[in-house]
Amino acid sequence: MTNIRKSHPLMKIVNNAFIDLPAPSNISSWWNFGSLLGVCLILQILTGLFLAMHYTSDTTTAFSSVTHICRDVNYGWIIRYMHANGASMFFICLYMHVGRGLYYGSYTFLETWNIGVILLLTVMATAFMGYVLPWGQMSFWGATVITNLLSAIPYIGTNLVEWIWGGFSVDKATLTRFFAFHFILPFIITAIAMVHLLFLHETGSNNPTGISSDADKIPFHPYYTIKDILGTLLLILALMLLVLFAPDLLGDPDNYTPANPLNTPPHIKPEWYFLFAYAILRSIPNKLGGVLALAFSILILILIPLLHTSKQRSMMFRPLSQCLFWTLVADLLTLTWIGGQPVEHPYITIGQLASIMYFLLILVLMPTAGTVENKLLKW
């Protein structure tokens, strides 16, 4: 008799994806972030569900309902802070996951990569809308500033913004629809993530060397299940350290002031994980130019497979490209720092230089390094 996990229609799918899946024997801890993102998503859906049971999406009561969750609901404070800081952990894992893909050439799996970019954009949209829900000062003004960017689109811009707002300013209608979208999007993300996994399992995982691992595969269970469990424990440890010892470390104090349309905060800025893109947006004096640069800073990921010039897939044996990759990481950290600073000298200049450097590295320097390395191979 065949094993039930191999014969049962449902168990068979799980078995082929998580148990008997042939995996490369040499994938490092950088390959843990996929499963960690899955854990983050489940955690966010669960904590979010419990928050939604007590939250009200009305401008008059939204702020009070969040306060009520923290003060009066049993363990409401821990659920709220796990959800808020869980978003930060989600983005740390996301950026690590994308960075791993860039470094080891995983973007040559085109379908998997492009669906990954769609996932990134969807998660960013979800996080942005979630930040609006507590209806604090930064929630309100963040929503106003970011949605207003669409007014830079010629001809239809103003109508588009008013359509998204559901009126002539960010108000009751905006908050209600943002809550509706914030609730539904994680489930859509789950569905897209399944497609992401489906395409990955068509080709099998990449590995640090970037060469085919068909000759040396091991079963996913128990080797990588135990490795993923360790990763998950470390993730939860990091999250709980943040939640229990410094819950407001990554938040903005302005969001503890209820939203007031008549009083603009001195420095409007998004959550830390959007600061790099915000810095690129601010570094261009023209509104439409800034919006285009902002969009392109993320959408540039779609072009990465086209910009691959090297004969080698991974950067493991390419010191020049490695150097540029870590320069790009440093550049993104610089942009993140600049995004949180006021718009004044010298931050403006640093931001502009870092923005130019970002596009220059990806579009010019890294493809050039690939070509140079190909030439060096012939020496």
UniProtKB/Swiss-Prot annotation:
CDD domains: cytochrome_b_C, Cytochrome_b_N
GO terms under cellular component: mitochondrial inner membrane; respiratory chain complex III
Protein residues bound to heme b b566: H97, H196
Domain of life: Eukaryota
Gene3D superfamilies: Cytochrome Bc1 Complex, Chain C (1.20.810.10)
Cofactor detail note: Binds 2 heme b groups non-covalently.
InterPro entries: Cyt_b/b6_C, Cyt_b/b6_C_sf, Cyt_b/b6_N, Cytb/b6-like_sf, Cytochrome_b, Cytochrome_b_C_euk/bac, Cytochrome_b_N_euk/bac, Di-haem_cyt_TM
Known cofactor(s): heme b
TM regions (residue ranges): 33-53, 77-98, 113-133, 178-198, 226-246, 288-308, 320-340, 347-367
Record: residues binding heme b b562: H83, H182
Pfam families in the cross-refs: Cytochrom_B_C, Cytochrome_B
Membrane topology designation: Multi-pass membrane protein
BP terms from Gene Ontology: mitochondrial electron transport, ubiquinol to cytochrome c
GO MF entries: metal ion binding; ubiquinol-cytochrome-c reductase activity
Keywords carried by this UniProt record: Electron transport, Heme, Iron, Membrane, Metal-binding, Mitochondrion, Mitochondrion inner membrane, Respiratory chain, Transmembrane, Transmembrane helix, Transport, Ubiquinone
Compartmental location: Mitochondrion inner membrane
UniProt binding sites for a ubiquinone: H201
The protein's assembly and partners: The cytochrome bc1 complex contains 11 subunits: 3 respiratory subunits (MT-CYB, CYC1 and UQCRFS1), 2 core proteins (UQCRC1 and UQCRC2) and 6 low-molecular weight proteins (UQCRH/QCR6, UQCRB/QCR7, UQCRQ/QCR8, UQCR10/QCR9, UQCR11/QCR10 and a cleavage product of UQCRFS1). This cytochrome bc1 complex then forms a dimer.
Family membership noted in the UniProt record: Belongs to the cytochrome b family.
Protein task: Component of the ubiquinol-cytochrome c reductase complex (complex III or cytochrome b-c1 complex) that is part of the mitochondrial respiratory chain. The b-c1 complex mediates electron transfer from ubiquinol to cytochrome c. Contributes to the generation of a proton gradient across the mitochondrial membrane that is then used for ATP synthesis.
Note: Heme 1 (or BL or b562) is low-potential and absorbs at about 562 nm, and heme 2 (or BH or b566) is high-potential and absorbs at about 566 nm.
Name this protein carries in UniProt: Cytochrome b
